[in-house]
Curated annotation (Swiss-Prot):
Location within or outside the cell: Membrane
Phylogenetic classification of the source organism: Eukaryota, Viridiplantae, Streptophyta, Embryophyta, Tracheophyta
Source organism (scientific name): Arabidopsis thaliana
Any single biological process term in GO: purine nucleobase transport
One Pfam family this sequence matches: PUNUT
Gene that encodes it: PUP11
Protein name, per record: Probable purine permease 11
CC per GO annotation: membrane
Length: 379
């Protein structure tokens, strides 16, 4: 009889229990070589995935802003490139050894339900990407990133209602601070906007970006709900498959939108009129698509190596890096209000992380006490 794998549950910042990878323990669906990693090797992998996530997200936002600045104007094309390079994710998926455990998970959940989940989530992703594209069209890269940081606050709210997670004082503090940060950006009369963008379009961009952040957080909660209640497993292969097939659906929706809106007719003229030339136009779109998938690899990798909560927190941290990168690349204006908003957002982020740290310590201490109790001989 096979030994039952050990699953260590770590309580996240919002009270949610999630599996965390521990080197010495056997976890369902995780390749054996990974379990044999030494501590420094595990940290190297975590660091590489953090770099992929932060670097990929910052680069994709900057390239998206560059596309608009240099003459690009197709919102559906900007939406399409956010998921179009999803075949890259087949590389790590194909490297995973096939196992009976994966097959049993598929048989435990009807194929039609899995397809329905992927289609619904894919459509939501496409709509979310469109909102992000509109937001980036009317906002500077730094302002856009600061508003996107509110996704952590929305995530706490949706997790409370959908995933039954706790709402602690520190989490509430984080939600309030991130809300204040977004409000400062919204009320900033000295807001820097791309050339030709009116105040009304700035407001549209703000609302679309805020709505996109909320929708993205809802998407994360729905994915977590799908893993826990329907798929009933969260292994690397299952997470990666969801990322691939939802991106496939989102890409199809974006292509349909591109043709249905008639924007495809303007693409040739857009490429010819691109300020940096036609080659630069193609390379900008290609590298935007690639960097978004590099970001996705980082997200999935951190879910695999640590937890989905940690992956989301690092994703939010990367949004604080983008304004600094935009300051260097695009010379974005950093007004006093924007600096204050960024500091408040970092404070809210730190509050969220600290709550996660406290909960993590409690679970680790409880686990150590339980292990010590099993080892000690009876008196």
């Amino acid at each position: 009889m096979a030994k039952e794998p050990v699953r260590v549950l770590v309580t996240g910042a919002a009270g949610n229990q999630e599996p965390i990878l521990v080197k010495e323990e056997s976890v369902v669906g995780i390749p054996t070589p990974l379990l044999k990693l030494k501590s420094w090797q595990w940290w190297v992998l975590v660091s590489v995935n953090i770099f992929f996530l932060i670097g990929g997200q910052a680069a994709s936002v900057l390239l998206g802003r560059f596309y608009y600045d240099e003459g690009g104007n197709s919102k559906w094309m900007a939406t399409l490139v956010q998921t179009a390079a999803f075949p890259i994710l087949y590389i790590p998926l194909l490297l995973l050894p096939s196992s009976a455990s994966v097959e049993s998970s598929e048989s435990s959940c009807s194929l039609k339900y899995i397809v329905l989940i992927y289609v619904l989530l894919g459509v939501i992703i496409a709509g979310d990407n469109m909102l992000y594209s509109v937001g980036l069209l009317y906002l500077s890269a730094s302002t856009y990133s600061l508003i996107c940081a509110t996704q952590l606050a929305f995530n706490a709210v949706f997790s409370y209602f959908i995933n039954a997670q706790k709402f602690t004082a520190l989490i509430l503090n984080s939600v309030v601070l991130l809300s204040f940060s977004a409000a400062l950006i919204a009320l900033n009369d000295d807001a820097d906007t791309p050339s030709g963008v009116s105040r009304s379009k700035y407001i549209v961009g703000f609302v679309c970006t805020l709505a996109a952040s909320a929708l993205y957080s809802l998407l994360l909660s729905l994915m977590q709900f799908s893993f826990e209640k329907i798929l009933k497993r969260e292994t690397f292969s299952v997470v990666l498959e969801m990322q691939i097939y939802t991106s496939l659906v989102a890409t199809c929706v974006s292509v349909i939108g591109l043709f249905a809106s008639g924007e495809w007719r303007t693409l040739h003229g857009e490429m010819e009129g691109y300020h940096k030339g036609q080659a630069s136009y193609v390379l900008t779109l290609v590298w935007t698509a690639v960097t978004w998938q590099v970001c996705s690899v980082g997200v999935v990798g951190l879910i695999f190596l640590v937890t989905s909560l940690f992956s989301n927190v690092i994703s939010t941290l990367s949004l604080a890096v983008t304004p600094l990168a935009a300051l260097v690349v695009f010379r974005d204006k950093m007004s006093g209000v924007k600096i204050m908003a960024m500091l408040i957002a970092i404070w809210g982020f730190a509050s969220y992380v600290y709550q996660n740290h406290i909960d993590d310590l409690k679970v680790r201490q409880a686990r150590q006490q339980a292990q010590a109790g099993r080892v000690e001989p009876p008196c």
